[in-house]
């Protein structure tokens, strides 16, 4: 579980990221990203499937972020949205998708 300080919790926070943020998408996940304090939100709509599948999708996305938290820039607010294709996908595929998308969005700290 992500610490509370790293979670987007208010509706107004989500609305701000959706309204002003830039969006990127890949096969399994879409993101909205905005400059601001390091915080993350996770969404899985009913298009993903029943509650079991939606919760699994959110857990997969949260786990990727939890393990790679130190690699993400401190001035980013990011909302991850699970797409319908995430059903039945392995953790490794979700991790690969999210990390490639964050790299494309220039949200990762450059490693030397």
Question: What label would you give each PLM region?
Answer:
Residues 1-112:
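Positively charged, solvent-exposed patches that mediate nucleic-acid binding
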């Amino acid at each position: 579980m992500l610490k509370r300080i790293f979670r987007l919790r208010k509706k107004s926070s989500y609305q701000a990221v959706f309204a002003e943020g830039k969006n990127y998408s890949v096969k399994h996940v879409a993101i909205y990203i905005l400059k601001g304090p390091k915080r993350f939100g996770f969404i899985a709509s009913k298009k993903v499937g029943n509650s079991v599948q939606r919760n699994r999708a959110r857990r997969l996305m949260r786990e990727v972020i939890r393990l790679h938290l130190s690699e993400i820039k401190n001035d980013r607010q990011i909302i991850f949205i699970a797409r319908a294709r995430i059903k039945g996908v392995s953790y490794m595929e979700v991790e690969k998708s999210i990390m490639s998308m964050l790299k494309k969005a220039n949200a990762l700290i450059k490693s030397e």
